[in-house]
Amino acid sequence: RQRQMCIRDRNVEDYFSDCAEEVGLELETRGIELVYANYVEDNVQVIADGEQIRRVIHNIISNAIKYMDKPKGIIQIRIKDVGDFIQVEIEDNGKGIAAKDLPSIFDRFYRTDVSRNSSKGGSGIGLSIVKKILEDHGGKVWATSRLGIGTIMYFVLRKYQEVPMK
């Protein structure tokens, strides 16, 4: 059953700080520190289905939690303004993803060797859902990672722009 997307313009600052607050509470219970920074001006709006983008953030973060191997876990969320898009960066200091695995992490059911052999293996669909939701929004998602250091997940959403009246 496909849920109808409820897309509307949302204030970037309000929306993402709410998301970060929710995530922060969950991370706190796990002893992981959240660092949140919004570099976007006050009244910028983004076109998004609020529930779906929450799910994107949740899936990325739960992945980061799953592969967190440091005694002091830190997850950073940065919101940046890049032209017609808002870019969200979610960085962790977990175990990282091997270069050979990076291109495939958004494929359905793909799991790295590490996760296949770990007790924490997930279903392998979390990040493919992320990719689908973002593509439905006309956005995209990608990642950079260094083994032993951590991973940065990036995604972009289109800004809402008032069309000036002629």
Place the predicted regions along the sequence by residue:
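Short, small-residue-biased leader/transition segments that mark boundaries at the very start
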Residues: 2-7
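A conserved beta-strand-to-alpha-helix junction within the catalytic ATP-binding
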Residues: 8-24
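Conserved catalytic submotifs in the C-terminal HATPase_c
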Residues: 28, 33-44
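Short beta-strand/loop element within the Bergerat-fold HATPase_c
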Residues: 74-84
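Acidic ATP/Mg2+-coordinating residue in the GHKL
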Residues: 92
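Short conserved segment of the HATPase_c
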Residues: 97-111
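Conserved glycine-rich
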Residues: 138-139
